[in-house]
Regions:
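Positively charged n-region of N-terminal signal peptides that target proteins for export
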Residues: 1-5
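Active-site-adjacent loops and short helices of periplasmic peptidoglycan-processing enzymes
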Residues: 18-159, 169-172
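Penicillin-recognizing serine hydrolase domain
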Residues: 21-24, 98, 124-265
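Bacterial N-terminal signal peptides
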Residues: 6-15
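Short, positively charged
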Residues: 6, 30, 188-189
């Protein structure tokens, strides 16, 4: 019996190790890009929902450049309808304004909305992914490769904690008028109101100006957050946490450590 129990415990520990997502983290100065903390920051990992930061960056630039309009109506495809959760609940043939799709993707992390954004801008998700990769190169996100607009696990769809930190900083720098989307606890997404998947972090960590969550089994729980204290701003990125509670604690700890360092300079 003792041998069987020992074998079971060993097997359980091995299973936990096999399915544990790799950990990575980075903290950068939001204004200067200076690295304040890093751990496995250049390891290429599954981004999960943080993919939507790239999707939204491309979409915001498409609006600003006149390629599409914020109130343009997007027709929903069967592909978008069939995306797995999290989702808004879009139906094939339905028409909805782009602004609502952006809200659903940014706040709820809706996969169906993300695919609809991609198809609305470029006609297909594959074409939009090529655009995402082009923007990534322009932004210096050299270790990222994007295959889809939502972040569901796909071979070769990878990024790093460093690239995500620089991308989120670019959001606040390049599209300040849209950055409030990442701070909304709830928002009207056209079909219904949706709740922010990062709401606990936004509510409980003072100074959080914006946050984006992601989760898949391959990625674990991950987040990117912009936090400000006094006149100092940082971007905190964590990959591979075991739970949202662990993720939030890690962000809070890294934020405290970074601000303590900045204050004493």
């Amino acid at each position: 019996m003792r041998l069987l129990l020992t074998c079971f415990v060993v097997a359980l520990l091995c299973a936990t190790t096999i399915f544990a997502a790799p950990y990575a983290a980075i903290v950068i100065n939001a204004d200067t890009g200076e690295v304040l903390h890093e751990e496995n920051a250049d390891t290429r990992l599954h981004p999960a929902g943080l993919t939507k930061l790239m999707t939204l960056y491309v979409a915001f630039d498409a609006i600003e450049s006149g390629l599409v309009e914020l109130d343009e109506t997007i027709r929903i495809s069967k592909k978008a309808e069939l995306e797995p959760p999290a989702k808004l609940g879009l139906r094939s043939g339905q028409r909805i304004k782009l602004r609502y799709l952006l809200r659903a993707a940014a706040v709820k992390g809706a996969n169906d909305a993300s695919t609809a954004i991609a198809e609305g801008i470029d006609g297909s998700e594959a074409a939009f992914a090529r655009r995402m990769n082009g923007y990534a190169q322009e932004l210096g996100l050299t270790r990222s490769s994007w295959k889809n607009a939502h972040g569901l696990t796909e071979k070769g769809h990878l990024t790093t904690a460093r690239d995500i930190a620089n991308l989120f900083a670019a959001h606040q720098r390049d599209f300040p008028d849209y950055f409030n989307l990442f701070s909304r606890i709830t928002t009207n997404a056209g079909l219904r109101d949706v709740v922010n998947s990062a709401r606990r972090l936004l509510v409980n960590l003072r100074g959080t100006e914006g946050a984006k969550y992601g989760y898949t089994r391959a990625a674990g729980f991950n987040t990117a957050a912009v936090v400000r204290h006094r006149d100092m701003g940082i971007v905190v990125v964590v990959f591979g946490a075991r739970s949202t509670a662990t993720l939030n604690k890690q962000v809070a700890m890294l934020s405290d450590k970074a601000f303590s360092e900045l204050i004493t300079r």
